[in-house]
């Protein structure tokens, strides 16, 4: 019995040793691949080149970021976003696309922020009438503070009529209302007459009442660039708007 027990013991030991030496069977058709480590998580790459600047009904947008100007820190965030793109703004004619249904105040804030960021001018593009230019270059208000007192001022009124008068104040000549807004032909006649009375200035200041959409303001600015008998080479946006006929303070 003792010999039999020893024999069984040696058989079990041998079996266990042979089991340790044997390798697991592999599938001959299985492809061996190295383990690939996932790439480290990093911040998404920032887009190269100047950001697209737009103003829509939702408000100003710098690149992919909407700026909520109605928030207490809205103006600060707009200035910060423009400051982060200073290389594309400072000393440049900066392109800006503004939708017709954008708020005048929002477009005004964007133009003002770009001017404070060092832009030489802001070239605004807006859909308009076929006879008007598709872009208008706006100079900063600061660059026009020394404009002669006789300089031309034009404004779109709440009742969708245009008013034209001089920077120093005086009678505002109002155009009749057309089918799709102010009568632009009559407006251009008033602009030419006002420009002839001020030969020392080629500046025109444009604005509108608060409830007027940007598209009509753009039409007015564009009309100043298509005069046949006068030339108004510098366009400046005033916002908020002055009262028609009153002296305009360029603060």
Where are these regions (language model features)?
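Long, low-hydrophobicity, acidic/polar, solvent-exposed interaction domains
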Residues: 21-251
């Amino acid at each position: 019995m003792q010999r039999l027990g020893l024999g069984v013991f040696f058989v079990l030991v041998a079996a266990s040793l042979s089991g340790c030496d044997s390798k697991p069977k592999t599938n001959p058709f299985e492809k061996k691949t190295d383990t690939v480590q996932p790439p480290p998580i990093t911040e998404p790459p920032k887009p190269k080149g100047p950001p697209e600047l737009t103003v829509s009904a939702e408000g100003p947008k710098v690149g992919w970021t909407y700026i909520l100007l109605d928030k207490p820190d809205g103006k600060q965030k707009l200035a910060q976003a423009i400051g982060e793109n200073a290389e594309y703004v400072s000393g440049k004619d900066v392109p800006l696309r503004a939708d017709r249904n954008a708020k005048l105040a929002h477009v005004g804030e964007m133009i003002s922020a770009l001017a404070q960021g060092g832009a030489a001018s802001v070239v605004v593009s807006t859909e308009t009438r076929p006879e008007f230019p598709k872009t208008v270059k706006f100079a900063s208000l600061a660059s026009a503070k020394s404009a002669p007192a006789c300089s031309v001022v034009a404004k779109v009124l709440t009742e969708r009529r245009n008013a034209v008068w001089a920077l120093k104040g005086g009678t505002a000549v109002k155009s009749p209302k057309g089918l799709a807004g102010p009568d632009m032909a009559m407006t251009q006649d008033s602009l030419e007459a006002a420009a002839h009375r001020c030969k020392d200035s080629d500046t025109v200041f444009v604005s509108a009442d608060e409830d007027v959409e940007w598209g009509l303001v753009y039409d007015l600015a564009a009309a100043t660039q298509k005069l046949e008998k006068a030339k108004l080479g510098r366009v400046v946006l005033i916002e908020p708007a002055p009262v028609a006929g009153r002296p305009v303070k360029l603060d």
